[in-house]
């Protein structure tokens, strides 16, 4: 049986702390105030743009960051869904193998929140052609959409990936 999702949405975690004088959380592990604002605005954007995600994944918390989990926690709470955070940042190939190897993901919408440095590799592991080789370091307002064809075998080569603006907060890019 084909276990290909309907689509996968990839996002980067919300903003991280920078200047301790400007951020309420300056530990470097959690989201900044703006990051928490972005996390709170995520659910309405996703519902309007893609519908309710059926499955939520985030990078496993580490001593350096819990930002991906924090970014999608308001969404998970609103949907009453769990966040799967079993995979470390470098374990993107194992995550892709799980998604494509388990029929529970077939025809479903999957949201993945990851660290920007590994999103292009994660995209490749998911069969997509990343819009760029690197996720821009200052970009917290983008969505990479991987829409899979309805039938197995309908696609040849890497899947084109749409690089979309989120436009959640003032100053976000519009294109």
Model-assigned labels for residue ranges:
Residues 2-107, 118-175:
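Active-site-proximal alpha-helix that buttresses catalytic centers in soluble enzyme cores
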Residues 113-115:
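Short beta-strand segments
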């Amino acid at each position: 049986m084909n276990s290909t999702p309907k689509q996968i949405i990839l996002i980067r975690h919300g903003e991280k702390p920078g200047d301790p004088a400007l951020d309420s959380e300056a530990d470097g592990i959690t989201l900044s105030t703006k990051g928490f604002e972005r996390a709170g605005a995520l659910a309405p954007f996703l519902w309007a743009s893609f519908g309710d995600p059926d499955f939520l994944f985030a990078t496993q918390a580490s001593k350096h960051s819990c930002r991906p989990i924090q970014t999608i926690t308001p969404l998970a709470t609103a949907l009453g869904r769990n966040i799967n955070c079993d995979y470390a940042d470098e374990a993107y190939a194992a995550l892709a193998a799980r998604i494509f190897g388990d029929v529970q993901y077939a025809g479903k919408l999957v949201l993945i929140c990851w660290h920007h440095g590994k999103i292009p590799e994660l995209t490749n592991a998911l069969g997509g052609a990343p819009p760029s080789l690197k996720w821009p370091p200052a970009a917290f307002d983008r969505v990479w959409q991987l829409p899979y064809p309805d039938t197995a075998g309908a696609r040849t080569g890497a899947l084109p990936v749409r690089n979309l603006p989120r436009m959640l907060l003032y100053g976000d890019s519009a294109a």
